[in-house]
Amino acid sequence: MELILLEKIANLGNLGDKVNVKAGYGRNYLLPFGKATAATAANLAAFEARRAELEKLAAEKKASAETRAAQLAELEVTITATAGDEGKLFGSIGTHDIADALTASGVEVAKSEVRLPNGTIRNVGEFDVAVHLHAEVEATVRVVVVAA
């Protein structure tokens, strides 16, 4: 399935690239979320007419993500959870909990932007958590988990 990307997609291409993807990826993700459009002659002409507008919009999104990254770089978030004697949590701290704590501290973060490559946090301690704000912008936040 040939598509024209309407924004930068990690590991796929940049704005305006004509890419060939599997049909399911195109139909179920790229097209419904407005990240791409079918590569027909009419859509190519329409895209070229809107190219400057889309590039400006992409630059604004990146600038917004960079300002949020600068705010996040200064933050250290403390999350309180119940834990046993050895520091093992009863339950875990996931992306939703971290996103809520960051939003409460003043920076709007969606749970889908928080990256926990090793899974949820299950122990008391300090952790560096990656926050993926944009295809080109990633910030690291220090999360401190303390026992209640």
Curated annotation (Swiss-Prot):
InterPro entries on file: Ribosomal_bL9, Ribosomal_bL9/RNase_H1_N, Ribosomal_bL9_bac/chp, Ribosomal_bL9_C, Ribosomal_bL9_C_sf, Ribosomal_bL9_N, Ribosomal_bL9_N_sf
One GO CC annotation: ribonucleoprotein complex
Keywords on record: Ribonucleoprotein, Ribosomal protein, RNA-binding, rRNA-binding
Pfam families: Ribosomal_L9_C, Ribosomal_L9_N
Keyword Lipid metabolism attached: no
Gene3D superfamilies: Ribosomal protein L9, C-terminal domain, Ribosomal protein L9, N-terminal domain
SUPFAM superfamilies named in the record: L9 N-domain-like, Ribosomal protein L9 C-domain
An example molecular function term from Gene Ontology annotations: structural constituent of ribosome
Domain of life: Bacteria
Biological processes annotated in GO: translation
Biological role: Binds to the 23S rRNA.
Similarity section: Belongs to the bacterial ribosomal protein bL9 family.
Alphabetized NCBIfam families for the sequence: L9 (TIGR00158)
This protein's name: Large ribosomal subunit protein bL9
Organism expressing this protein natively: Pseudomonas fluorescens (strain ATCC BAA-477 / NRRL B-23932 / Pf-5)
Organism ancestry: Bacteria, Pseudomonadati, Pseudomonadota, Gammaproteobacteria, Pseudomonadales
Gene expressing this chain: rplI
